[in-house]
């Protein structure tokens, strides 16, 4: 269905080998190691739907073409419970099942643990290597100071997202005071630091009214935080919160009648528009690699195909980069003629993928995908630019800034060791 261009492209004692040799027709398996239970289970379920959609698209097109013939892809779901420690347990389980490809993204802390483990374990076991594909963990260090040959990121990192948001904040002349509220882990701290830097460079007249972190996944009532924001006099909030930490935050803002804009990384996702309702119209700004109202016949066709496959309103959260990651992984396997993780990692380097509406390239230097970004504003469905709503809420997003792929790259500090 999709097309690609320029396809120039025993973990420790007692651990079993992850084999890359396949019998003809045997599935090539990808292990999704993600929090499928706990406070972010809804985010894990959304990831599974998107990856499964990508797997089904690849298989409908004939699967992965290796030297010995065509093979279907298979998604194997392993529950990390959102914990780095449990993620490493599931990494071992994937190895014991001879799975050479691992997907994860909902936590930069988990991603960092997986990268560190794979760096060591792949070095010790050159015949049982595993490759990590990352769809959402946005800590810039993962393709910077802590980059790895065994890791490729298919999402824009936090710095790239913040740069796009800053373009919109820079022209918001009503902006005077900003409150930074983020989850207390590496990604949340990155968002805070990047927001401070962006505002200092682009809007030095804007005051930081507060800079606060909260425990991730543990706050059930954000009312005290909303009270602090109100007391600070801030007219905008910048947050990288995601999952229930975002939904509960915006719900508290609506209930307390907070009259402030929200500049978010994920304000278009997982219940946030419904939680805000009319209170979010014109006040919630989000940034993403794609959204249903991006426009164009092929973009619309992708969205409608996803909704046909997952028609329930609560499942209406298509994330193009996630299904595209699976399609690019399959393209790299076909290019290499092999499901060997080393060959596939090399084939991914420099791989350009064009589906007709979201052309992207995997930068070889640091394994960071370069793709377009969209900054969007919440409004009622049916208003100009908002043909599709989110999750049956009656609210959707219109593009206020489209950043072409060639404008999104940022310098990298990656110094990669290659096998």
Residue ranges: model-predicted function:
Residues 148, 250-324, 333-339, 392-418:
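Extracellular/periplasmic periplasmic-binding protein-like sensory domains
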Residues 94-108, 125-135, 179-182, 233-243, ...:
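Periplasmic-binding protein-like
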Residues 352, 356-419:
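Solvent-exposed, acidic/polar segments of extracytosolic/periplasmic ligand-binding ectodomains
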Residues 21-25:
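Boundary at the C-terminal end of the N-terminal hydrophobic targeting segment
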Residues 31-54, 79-84, 107, 181-190, ...:
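Extracytoplasmic "Venus flytrap"
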